[in-house]
Amino acid sequence: MIIKNGEGESKIIGKAITLPTPKIFPQPFFIRLSEYTSEGNLWDNENFEFNSGKVECNGEDYDLAPSTCSLAKFDEDDGSKKLI
């Protein structure tokens, strides 16, 4: 996933699954990442806004609309990291 905002461009790569979302508009986007690596400053923030972004899955690119992102980080007992 690549996110761009006033702080620059940030990238995160890892195993991801999408999570259930409520039937509201605009529809939120929930994703959980594990075994990930990241580049850029955004992933250190709990909340941030972004102007543009994209998700790549199986060689296909999907654009993200401008939005606000909220993050929760978890350290697992086995030393791995998860990001929701």
Swiss-Prot record:
InterPro entries: Dicty_CAD. Pfam families: Dicty_CAD. GO terms for biological process: cell adhesion. Belongs to the csb family. This is Uncharacterized protein csb family protein DDB_G0291672.
